[in-house]
């Protein structure tokens, strides 16, 4: 796919950090924070400084390998948190990256009962509401920086359950002529439950 846009998938949730960021990592330099921690502490200057430093290092690492970055997004939507989104947009502008992902998903339902009889689905509805709220705030930041974004996203409500039906019904709920991102994690296992990213969020 020679024309496929490649994102910098910014990560401060798992794995090893590229920088010294003790507010994000354990003593071994591995990320060990949760989404709630980031929301509650998003106004703390020192934390934001370390996040910017780590995001910058990750962008630079990609650029060192001669990869042109088309857009920015993040692991488990950490950049959606409004104060972190501001950092992301600042870096996008600095590195001439024109697109930053936003996470507004229209609520939709697949007419299959088993899709909803699990512990993940109610939590996914909470995620949708939170990310919708963040996106409404973040669109103002996008405009301030003159950046572009997708109009909608599909895949949050059915995280861990994505299939052709989830995509089909998700697209039906969205206005035509919209830019849409579908969140799909390639599977490693025949047992789809082993590929679930629900716990990460």
Model-assigned labels for residue ranges:
Residues 74-76:
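Active-site histidine-anchored catalytic micro-motif
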Residues 78-80:
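Acidic, metal-coordinating catalytic cores used for nucleic-acid/nucleotide bond scission
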């Amino acid at each position: 796919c020679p024309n496929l846009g490649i994102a910098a998938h910014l990560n401060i949730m798992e794995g090893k950090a590229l920088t010294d960021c003790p507010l994000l990592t354990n003593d071994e330099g591995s990320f060990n924070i949760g989404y709630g921690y980031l929301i509650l502490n998003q106004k703390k200057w020192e934390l934001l400084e370390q996040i910017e430093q780590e995001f910058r290092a990750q962008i630079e690492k990609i650029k060192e390998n001669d990869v042109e970055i088309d857009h920015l997004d993040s692991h488990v939507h950490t950049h959606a948190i409004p104060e972190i989104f501001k950092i992301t947009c600042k870096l996008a502008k600095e590195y001439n990256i024109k697109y930053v992902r936003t996470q507004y998903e229209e609520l939709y339902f697949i007419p299959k009962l088993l899709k909803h009889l699990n512990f993940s689905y109610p939590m996914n509805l909470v995620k949708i509401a939170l990310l919708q709220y963040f996106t409404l705030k973040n669109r103002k930041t996008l405009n301030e920086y003159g950046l572009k974004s997708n109009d909608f996203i599909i895949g949050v409500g059915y995280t861990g359950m994505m299939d052709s039906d989830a995509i089909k019904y998700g697209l039906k709920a969205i206005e035509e002529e919209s830019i849409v991102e579908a969140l799909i994690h390639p599977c490693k296992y025949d047992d789809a439950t082993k590929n679930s990213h629900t716990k990460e969020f």
